[in-house]
Amino acid sequence: MQEALLPPAHPGRFYSDFGPKPFGSGDQRLSSPNLLTNGGDLFYGCYSPFSPTRVLSPPPPRRAASFSHCSSSSDSVVDDGDGAGAAAATEHRLHLAHLALQYQEMANRFELCLSHLADAADEAAALRQENAELRVANNDLACRIAKFGGRQSSAIALAGDLRRLRLPKEQTVPALPPPPQSPPAALMNPVAVPEKQAVLPKSISIRSTGYQKLNQGGKHRVSKPVNVGSQRVFVGIDGAEGGEHKVGVKKEEPPMGGLEFEVYNQGMFKTELCNKWEETGACPYGDQCQFAHGVAELRPVIRHPRYKTQVCRMVLAGGVCPYGHRCHFRHSITPADRFSFGH
């Protein structure tokens, strides 16, 4: 018995059930045939209605395939973009790290410069302090040198003035007869005062018999200084007697053995040396000062004939005389004075 294969009554329905489904309105000639999921023959799946099973795996839609293809492409693009972004981020982080290192290095250099500046400031302050101390020391030394130089120049000026005045010493010197037909030795060879031992005197004192007066009873008494502006006194060197007369009164010429001076009373104008000028070399009063600024301005003072001829008892006893240079007694003690005071 022969079995004839009959075509199906509705071939379109058969192909619609088992054939490939159209995707849109495209050409279906290029569509691939369906394959069985269980690995069966293609013939039974495509043409035979008597296939062992009716379950067929549906073909994947083209849209899903296209979407998966696009997704894979986009994933690859995203992966490429992520790699480029990661590289850029890494490079940016490296750049920031490099900038941080540079900033730290600059901060370290700044701190080092600040420390050097602080050291330089301390050194400058120390140098300023040392300069100030040296300036004070130099000023002190300059003042001392000026004071010493002023005293030395004053001593030299005093020596020159004493040579010019040719004043005798306060102590009595025995008179020597001058040689015949020759000037006095004191006038030819004046006593030179050593410059190293020369000291500025507080006053120039000249002992004269004109200091005292005779009373009516004929007895000598020490009276007050003559109340006149000035007197001219002759001081004998070779034993000649001295005398005095008022200004404006004629008097005979003094002999060759003495000198004549214009003397003043104690306490008058310019009769005593200025202490301020002697200490510092300058006086704030200037020309208005009542005291002498140097030996050239110092005017002689008339004294008692026994002025400074006896030793002061207070000094001889070892005490301090309150009168100082104004004392009328001698403050220099000799061995003879000590011997006489002990007995």
From Swiss-Prot:
SUPFAM superfamilies documented for this protein: CCCH zinc finger
Signal sequence range: none
Coiled-coil spans in chain: 114-147
GO MF annotations, alphabetized: DNA binding; mRNA binding; zinc ion binding
Keyword Zinc: yes
Keyword tags: Coiled coil, DNA-binding, Metal-binding, Repeat, Zinc, Zinc-finger
Top-level division of the source organism's lineage: Eukaryota
Zinc finger region(s), C3H1-type: 268-296, 306-334
DNA-binding recorded as keyword: yes
Record protein name field: Zinc finger CCCH domain-containing protein 39
